Structures are given as C-alpha cells and as structure tokens.
Amino acid sequence: MLIDAHCHLDHLSGDEANTFLEHLSEKGLQALIACGTKSEDWEFYQNLSHKFPALKVCYGIHPLEITDNWQKDLDALEKFIPQSVAVGEIGLDFHGIFQQEHIPQMKLQMKVFERQLRLAKKFDRPVVIHCRDAFPILKEILIYSQFPLQRVMFHCFVEDREAAQWIEARGGYVSYSGVLTFKKPGNTVETATQFPLDRIFVETDSPYLAPVPFRGKQNSPEFVHYVAQKLAEIKNISLEACIQITSNNTRKFFGF
C-alpha cells in the first residue's frame, strides 16, 4: 500500500479527521506524513498521532505562517519536535514579493528558516522543505548552515533540471505531487525522468493540488495513487514496483 509523503489535515474537523484515519487502509494507504505548519495546529496533529500510529507528524513554521510571535512559536516548536518524524514544512516562499518593500519579510523568512534548521540538527530530525521562487537563496542557507542534504526532502518539487542535479549530487530527496499529472507539468516530468527513483517520494499536498482527473477539486491523501501511477509511467516500471520503492524511501527517510 501507498504512503502519502506530504499532506495536511487541519482543514478537517476533529471528527472528520478521526473518521478518515480510521478507514486509511480501505483507501489503499499504509501511512500519511502530515505537516502542521503553524503553532495553532500542532496540538491538533499531536492528538491525532497519539490515536492513529499510521499518522506520522511533522511540526514547523511555514514561511507564509510567520507572525509577529515567531520567537514564541519557535520556543513552542522545540517542545513538539521530539514527538515528530521531521521538522516541516519549513523554507522560503518569495512568490510575488520581489519588491523593495518586501525585503524585511524576505529576511525574516530566511532567519526563521535558519533557526528551524538549527532545531532540526539539535533534535536529529530531517527537514521537509517548502521552496517557491527562492531556490538560489534557500540553497545558500543550506550550504551556510551545513545541513546535510541526505536529510532534506524538497516537497512538491517543481524546480528546474539544474536544481535537481544539485540536490541529487548531494544525496537529497524530492517529492512529486499532483503537478506531475497536469497537462502543463512544468519541469516535473523532466526532473522525475532523471532523478534516481530511490530518492523520490510521492505526495498529495492535500487539500491542495489535486491530480488529474480531480484537478480543481479538493485533494485527498488517497489520490496519491494517481501520482504514483504517473511516476511509474515516467520511470517505465510497474505501479506495484513504484509503490514499493517510494514507500520504502519514505519509511527510510522518516525513520519508521
């Protein structure tokens, strides 16, 4: 059975999340990696993970969820990380903010990202990275922080061939979402063709980015099947082999 390597459940009520997780195996899923992206959500995920062992949880401050209380949030995060499989999702999102007045916002994202890399090192956790329109700077922060790429997952990977080669050369991991199935998939098909299968994950990023044939609708973790199917076509292997390899990759990276 499949593992959705990256999803969100905080759009659901507690009862809805409980019902969904109770029937996980019926949906063809053996596990989910869910990310709490802001402090208000961490307890929600913590409570769910205590009830459902198949739910593996990451905690982090998403770059677009940084508030004026970011220092308090980092202090709180330190208490949740020991109960997580990774720190995430964290990173940089510079989409649409390249104007002069946005420089303080960009600098704050960089600071909070670097601080969370330090916490991941402190607690010996891998990281799940969100990167949008910021790869050159994010790369420099990873180099400066000396964070090992072997413990980095680039979620919803859409970067170009050059970025993929840089990640591959340093032992990093990438995760493909429903974008891989789109009519206009950007760089994803090219990089998925070339990237080593033993360092690829499949994800939904639900409730966002529903794959074809559900594009435009609310995404759900069971739709990861369509991402795996597309990846199997690209790699010219059976769906069963693709599921086995990507699931093994996910378990190995997150340590379960």
Annotated model-derived regions:
Residues M1-F256:
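Mid-domain alpha/beta scaffold segments of enzyme catalytic cores
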